[in-house]
């Protein structure tokens, strides 16, 4: 058990989902029902805070050797306050992530394929000394974050992963886009809604999620 200081009147609740070498930082509203908690928001964090949230998310996963995790932070102005960084089986249900669901499935597919084809395996040795050396140094906080991000990118072989995606999986994004726009995906959505919500709410939620996923298709077309 541990105690955390409260952060009053925060500007944004950032929930970042990290899958392998990729991270999506999303605006989260914990006070709302599950289907409304993720707000479709673009550039909702100040640039410096966005980079810090991204670096912390990657750092946590690399340090603990996690490949699928979410990290939660409260942001006040440019200040980032991590509050919960151990969600090693995060919720990625279509009825929760909605707009961000295609990205999550695509990232899972890319990372799994990359690991399977290249033979990449997680390292059992966590090399914590590398991270403690950064923490114990006289560098500024910003310089430490930059070095943590470098260590994380090296562990997840970010450059090699991106090259693999650009060459071996070059058509995957288009395939996923076509899938999300297809009748088969819509049938999956309808079946999920029917198995999740009571009958009198199903039409409402089918329309709700169709709208959000249609927005994703629009934003990722062309």
Predicted segments, located by residue:
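Phosphate-binding site of ATP-dependent enzymes
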Residues: 1-61, 80
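Short, well-ordered beta-to-alpha junction loops that form the rim of enzyme active sites
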Residues: 6, 73, 85
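A short glycine-rich, hydrophobically flanked beta-strand micro-motif that places a catalytic Asp/Glu
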Residues: 14, 66-78
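C-terminal active-site "lid" helix and adjoining low-complexity regulatory extension at the edge
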Residues: 48, 76-222
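Conserved short hydrophobic interaction patches
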Residues: 60-63, 111
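Surface-exposed helix-capping loop/turn segments at secondary-structure junctions
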Residues: 64-67, 119-120
